[in-house]
């Protein structure tokens, strides 16, 4: 899976995605009219997809359209990510929803105004 997200402030978006998901970045690609940052999973983001942050007059942040759902491994990791979201300029705009069967889910806006989601899964204890 590869994700491309439009941004208006590349430095701010880099801080957000590094801080929330532990992604590491590669050198910037300057491909006029776009400036592109590629972020890759690190040890702290085991199942995170690769992400490109694109600053371009052809791409605009949005809270509609396709919804990208980032998965973290534990409910504790979900709570830690939500703390980082708030600290790095994002907005959590729904409560964490317990979807049953050990799944939790929440919607938010990143620091650029893109709507994304977070989910976590922990197996339920055996009865």
Tell where the protein language model's regions lie, with residue ranges:
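Acidic/polar helix N-cap motif
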Residues: 9, 74-77, 110
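Short hydrophobic/aromatic beta-strand element in the GNAT-like acyltransferase core
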Residues: 36, 50, 69, 105-107
